[in-house]
Amino acid sequence: MRGIILAGGSGTRLHPLTIGVSKQLLPVYDKPLVYYPLSTLIMAGIRDILVITTPADAPAFRRLLGDGSDFGVNLSYAAQNEPEGLAQAFLIGADHIGNDTVALALGDNIFYGPGLGTSLRRFEHVSGGAIFAYWVANPSAYGVVEFDADGKAVSLEEKPKTPKSHYAVPGLYFYDNTVIDIARSLKKSARGEYEITEVNQIYLNRGQLSVEVLARGTAWLDTGTFDSLLDASDFVRTIELRQGLKVGAPEEIAWRAGFIDDDQLATRAKELLKSGYGHYLLQLLDRE
């Protein structure tokens, strides 16, 4: 399976913060935002990842993430010249995907919960599409999925004014290779975008879409507004101070997955000692 992190867009809802820097490079407590979706893909066992950014932001992402070797993955980069919808990621990333399955993680979404990594690895050989549903108070801000009395998904809508349910679709999607042809067949919506909801609707119409409700106790944080960005930082800070364990540290997750060894973790840690982040990584070696 190949991975894609979509970290483009103009971030207008966060202006003036994002006039000079990509939204996905903003801090969420002690880490840049993009570390969290990167961690999610590593938890899913994915080692070949394409990072899609704006042309202007590409150098900063390369400086931060490099070739991925610090995290035991292979990172490549592509430019999204104009933000034309989430499904555009499959057009930009078609060569990266090749004949493989693919996971798309939105660069501003954070996932946290018990057993998340084990759960995500199930989709490595996905047939059709697999998405998630998460109960939210304000579904009109998201893509919304409706279930029938038997818990079967029956409809999908993108940011509806009158939602048919409170179940939003988070920014993590798994697809088989058909998604490339589906994306190529799309026409732009009234918003001028290639909609991910339409991709999911096509899979649903074919009877090939799995929709799984995220378990209670799993947190999904969307950081697209000032308040949600601050809420995400507060959430991460609270857990880390309470437990003494990092949330969304890709080096730790890669090490636990066997993507990097003890020596590689120690080398990375020594580069980050002054902030305390490196000390945390070194302590992992002492604890285990």
Curated annotation (Swiss-Prot):
Keywords: Magnesium, Metal-binding, Nucleotidyltransferase, Transferase. It holds the Pfam family NTP_transferase. GO terms for molecular function: glucose-1-phosphate thymidylyltransferase activity; magnesium ion binding. DTDP-alpha-D-glucose binds at G8, K23, Q24, Q80, G85, D108, N109, G143, E158, K159, V169, D222. Belongs to the glucose-1-phosphate thymidylyltransferase family. NCBIfam families: rmlA. GO terms for biological process: dTDP-rhamnose biosynthetic process; polysaccharide biosynthetic process; rhamnose biosynthetic process. Mg(2+) binds at D108, D222. Its EC number is 2.7.7.24. SUPFAM superfamilies: Nucleotide-diphospho-sugar transferases. Binds 1 Mg(2+) ion per subunit. DTTP binds at G8, G11, T12, R13, K23, Q24, Q80, G85, D108. The gene is rmlA. This is Glucose-1-phosphate thymidylyltransferase. Transmembrane segments: none annotated. It is an enzyme of class 2 (transferase). It catalyses: dTTP + alpha-D-glucose 1-phosphate + H(+) = dTDP-alpha-D-glucose + diphosphate. Gene3D superfamilies: Spore Coat Polysaccharide Biosynthesis Protein SpsA, Chain A (3.90.550.10). The keyword Transcription does not apply. Pathway: Carbohydrate biosynthesis; dTDP-L-rhamnose biosynthesis. Catalyzes the conversion of glucose-1-phosphate and dTTP to dTDP-glucose and pyrophosphate. Involved in the biosynthesis of the dTDP-L-rhamnose which is a component of the critical linker, D-N-acetylglucosamine-L-rhamnose disaccharide, which connects the galactan region of arabinogalactan to peptidoglycan via a phosphodiester linkage. Its cofactor is Mg(2+).
